[in-house]
């Protein structure tokens, strides 16, 4: 295809689509799956799934991880990797999305504006070793790693205690 003639396979191609316009009689799931399949057939490697901001009469339904279901549908029906976003605010949400195969990448915006150390804290939470961080950060971040690991253990213990008996089996 013309796309791959310009960008060889060493250069990944991503396109961003709006999976819904949130408008009555607007973009349908069928429309989205069709365009996703077309993009895949012409050499697109990954689709950045967004929603809305295309018509003035939209009525979006937002909330935590609100765009993930659209990414999931495209990824698992059109069989093309996806990027998702939409009020994803912590590492547990990211892990849930990736490990459950709902997207291949998670785009973060607002969490990084609120906390520029979000990624470093996530590394600590996930038990990365101090040797995994750049030398220039070591003295400032090393104590954070042990603190985050302790907090994670406490949080996991609390989650287990609060889990309903019906879910413990």
Where do the model's predicted regions map?
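Flavin-dependent oxidoreductase catalytic cores
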Residues: 1-169
């Amino acid at each position: 295809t013309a796309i791959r003639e310009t960008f060889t396979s060493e250069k990944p191609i991503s396109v961003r689509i709006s999976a819904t316009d949130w408008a009555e009689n607007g973009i349908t799931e069928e429309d989205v799956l069709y365009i996703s399949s077309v993009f895949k057939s012409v050499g697109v490697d990954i689709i950045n799934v967004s929603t809305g901001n295309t018509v003035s009469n939209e009525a979006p339904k937002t909330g935590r991880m609100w765009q993930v279901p659209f990414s999931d549908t495209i990824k698992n029906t059109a069989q093309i990797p996806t990027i998702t976003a939409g009020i994803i605010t912590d590492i547990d949400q990211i892990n849930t999305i990736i490990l459950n195969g709902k997207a291949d990448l998670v785009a973060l915006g607002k969490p990084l504006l609120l906390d520029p150390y979000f990624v470093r804290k996530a590394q600590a939470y996930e038990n990365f070793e101090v040797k995994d961080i750049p030398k220039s950060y070591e003295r400032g971040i090393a104590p954070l790693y042990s603190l985050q690991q302790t907090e994670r253990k406490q949080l996991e213990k609390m989650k287990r205690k609060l889990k309903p008996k019906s879910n413990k089996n």
